[in-house]
Design a protein with these regions (language model features):
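Conserved functional hotspots at enzyme active or ligand-binding sites that engage polyanionic ligands
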Residues: 1-174
Length: 174
């Protein structure tokens, strides 16, 4: 029975990789390999990876549903709790950046998107945060630190305020 279950699973995986996600096959396989290698870790600390609030990390979000960040992307660490980090996924996609809300330059933009000002030291392109896709994840998903935003900086505080507005949709809460 166990052998049949395994064969059925492998056949299904093969079909999925060949048909449903052909454009993401490399990312999907890499994500699965990352999960196999790190999925049993309590945190990134188990492999010598220590993260701090404000770090921008390259990480593996794993498989995703539609409208969720998946596979390997950058993320901004907003908080740490019990070996898990609250991470906001980000992209350098120019079209997404152009659609992001900014009270001065794009007041009609999407409020779930937060454009980071300029190019952050350690990154190569302008980036935008997906505020409505933030989540707590095991820090073992994190592969490499790429940059850092000072938690006392005005930009970090603006991100925190926008999160509060997005979550509670009432500026008086802030």
């Amino acid at each position: 029975m166990k052998e049949t279950v395994l064969q059925n699973y492998m056949q299904l995986k093969t079909e999925v990789y060949e048909s449903i996600i052909p454009k993401n096959i490399e990312h999907a396989i890499l994500s699965e390999a990352n999960w196999l290698g790190r999925g049993n870790l309590m945190s990134g600390e188990d492999v010598g990876f220590f993260v701090e609030v404000g770090d921008i990390v390259y990480m593996d979000y794993g498989q995703a549903y539609l409208n969720e960040m998946g596979y390997q992307h950058f993320g901004l660490v907003m908080a740490i709790s019990e070996k898990k980090a609250l991470v906001i996924p980000m992209t350098s996609n120019a079209k997404t950046y152009a659609n992001a809300y900014d009270p001065e330059s794009n007041p009609e933009g999407k409020k779930n998107l937060f454009p980071l000002p300029g190019i952050i030291d350690g990154l190569c392109k302008k980036s935008v945060l997906f505020l409505n896709d933030m989540k707590f994840v095991n820090t073992a998903r994190m592969i490499e630190k790429k940059a850092h935003i000072d938690v006392k900086s005005p930009v970090f505080r603006k991100i925190q305020l926008r999160i509060m507005m997005l979550l509670f949709q009432n500026p008086s809460v802030i």
